[in-house]
Amino acid sequence: MELRNKKISLDDFMSERFHVLKTWHTGKDVENFEDGVKYQQTIPESKNFARALFEADCNGITLSQPRAGVALIEEHIELLKTLQKDCDLLPTTIDAYTRLNRYEEAAVGIQKSIEAGTSKLNGLPVVNHGVKACRRITESLSKPLQIRHGTPDARLLAEIAMASGFTSYEGGGISYNIPYAKRVTLEKSIRDWQYCDRLIGVYEEHGIRINREPFGPLTGTLIPPFVSHAVAIIEGLLALEQGVKSVTVGYGQVGNIVQDIAAIQSLRELAHEYFRANGYENYELSTVFHQWMGGFPEDESRAFAVISWGAAVAGMAGATKVITKSPHEAYGIPTAEANGQGLRASNQMLNMVRDQKFPPCVEVDREVALIKREVRAVMDKVLELGQGDIAIGTVRAFEAGVLDVPFAPATCNSGKMMPIRDNHGAIRVFDPGSVPLPKDVLTLHHDFIAERAKEEGRIPSFQMIIDDINAVSHSKLIGRP
């Protein structure tokens, strides 16, 4: 089917669904779509993710959510029961094999986990476990549950997850391709994610509201806000076209408080601007702030400082939720206790700043205005390349380098745009590649970088970028020599 941003007809969706469900044997358990609808109708409102976000947004509260997932059902339930004591929203992180649709290898990982008595996978293989087993998860917990993964083709995973009672689904055809895959075409990943969004749209038509969350941080490595904003807005538009009504747009912390506050503010405003300009009115919008996604200090005390700083900024920025980290981040997958420690530190900070929203100031206003100019310049070109079709325009924009995600593995990503920190730690553009930023905006970025270069007594270079990538793990924000 030719790629375009048009709602998939129910007949075409059901025809494609027939083939999707045959890609692994557990697909047969969701053949009766009405069974999934009836099961979702039994989920209490208190466990609906979209409802929790809507209420938090209305009340100006920032919710907390960790990342977590292990190979076996009972162990996963035990892990989440431990975490739900300290969080508002629960995750289920999916293993790496499932993300690549390598279900045979996921099955081997399950067996090895059983034999070893500990998880040998870095997440829960939902497709392999199937609906019946996964419903035990949603029935055993009291908080709303979201699937978090990194899957370019997440169609079967979405089918099983929704029929199992999960009420939020993270990802998108760009954000779960460009940072995660190497040789998956954007045409395929965007089209496959249109299926996921249409699935959620069909649930919506049956009165079941399921939240969709594009993955904001992308590669998590010095991402300028305008880059992640553009991707989030595009994926939001694609989701809304397929009938999704609850959208959470995300952003990964960069560490400079002014830029981070401005990013959350501008993200919400720009999303509304583009959604409404494209004719979408009846939707619920929320935001998610991801605590620092780059390298962490090995020392736990320093790691707690990074975590707490992220929580404080998320709260003061007015994000609807914050995705937390753990003090074991530098070492890999955290224990349940370490994950809980990160949550408790975050919650303490969220509670302390709850009544302390960041005050209006000229610096934030200037940064908001700059981000908006950058996003509009990119989005205008994307729409121009697609002749008004955002799906086609996105593919062509990546081909032309108009959309370019720093440090991404995907071959369909140019990788020519290079970011760098300025003298205050904000992310600026060192080399724009083919990204069509206005000349005066590029001059502004050049001047920001020149100020830092003068301070450090060195010429801006790729070495400075490397220093910035490693800086937080070395207990600073800017990669000073």
Curated annotation (Swiss-Prot):
Return one GO MF term: methylaspartate mutase activity
List the InterPro entries: Cbl-dep_enz_cat, Glu_mut_E, Glu_mut_E_C_dom_sf
Do the record's keywords include Zinc?
no
UniProt EC number: 5.4.99.1
The protein's matches in CDD domains, at most eight in alphabetical order, are given as:
Glm_e
Top-level EC class as recorded in UniProt: isomerase
* Alphabetical UniProt keywords: Cobalamin, Cobalt, Isomerase
Q: Which residues bind L-glutamate?
A: R67, R99, R148, H149, E170, Y176, Y180
- Give the catalytic activity: (2S,3S)-3-methyl-L-aspartate = L-glutamate
What does this gene product do? Catalyzes the carbon skeleton rearrangement of L-glutamate to L-threo-3-methylaspartate ((2S,3S)-3-methylaspartate).
Spell out the family assignment given in the record's similarity comment.
Belongs to the methylaspartate mutase GlmE subunit family.
Protein's recorded name: Glutamate mutase epsilon subunit
What's the source species for this entry? Yersinia enterocolitica serotype O:8 / biotype 1B (strain NCTC 13174 / 8081)
The gene name on file is glmE
